């Protein structure tokens, strides 16, 4: 997986990411979702460049709307909506759980909130300890990891090697 996944690719439409982590059913209950973005707001996306700096991403302005079920709707500039819920894990991070558009499965990313910035990590299955993943119940595919048999998803995500953030959102 390329470490240069854009904010738009990470959040918009379908969460179709090579090297992604997914499940056929949600691993985190909706009622345990937390309000990491408060009541929501307007956010500008930035992509991380090879030198570690961030560059404003084209077409990456999101309106984040809080839903009644504890999750959020990320609405892009084309009015496409990506529902997502956030769940706390160790280390002060949050797992974003989102249904993939057009598929009956869920994709996952990790967020770290720092003031008005949200750093987005897309854990790459290829860069994880394969023996440890199998021990935890992960089904390893060619470009993705299926976590339906993982008993403790919060501990699983907290144990992953996240690498560098691929992008960030900044509240406007």
Task: Please tell me what each predicted stretch does.
Residues 16-19:
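C-terminal motif of bacterial Sec signal peptides marking the signal peptidase cleavage site
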Residues 21-39, 46-59, 65-172:
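Calycin-type beta-barrel ligand-binding domains and close structural analogs
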Residues 1-9:
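Bacterial N-terminal signal peptides that target proteins for export
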């Amino acid at each position: 997986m390329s470490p240069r996944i854009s904010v738009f690719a990470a959040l918009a439409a379908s969460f179709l990411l090579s090297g992604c982590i997914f499940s056929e059913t949600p691993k985190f209950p909706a009622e345990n979702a937390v309000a990491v973005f408060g009541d929501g707001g307007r956010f500008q996306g930035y992509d991380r460049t090879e030198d570690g700096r961030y560059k404003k991403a084209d077409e990456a302005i999101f309106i984040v709307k809080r839903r009644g079920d504890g999750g959020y709707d990320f609405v892009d500039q084309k009015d496409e909506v990506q529902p997502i819920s956030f769940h706390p894990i160790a280390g002060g991070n949050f797992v974003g759980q989102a249904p993939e558009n057009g598929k009956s499965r869920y994709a996952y990313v990790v967020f770290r909130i720092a003031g008005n910035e949200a750093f987005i990590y897309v854990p790459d299955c290829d860069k994880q300890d394969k023996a440890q993943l199998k021990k935890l119940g992960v089904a390893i595919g060619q470009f993705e990891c299926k976590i339906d048999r993982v008993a403790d998803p919060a501990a699983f995500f907290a144990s992953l090697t996240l690498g560098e953030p691929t992008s960030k959102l900044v509240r406007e």
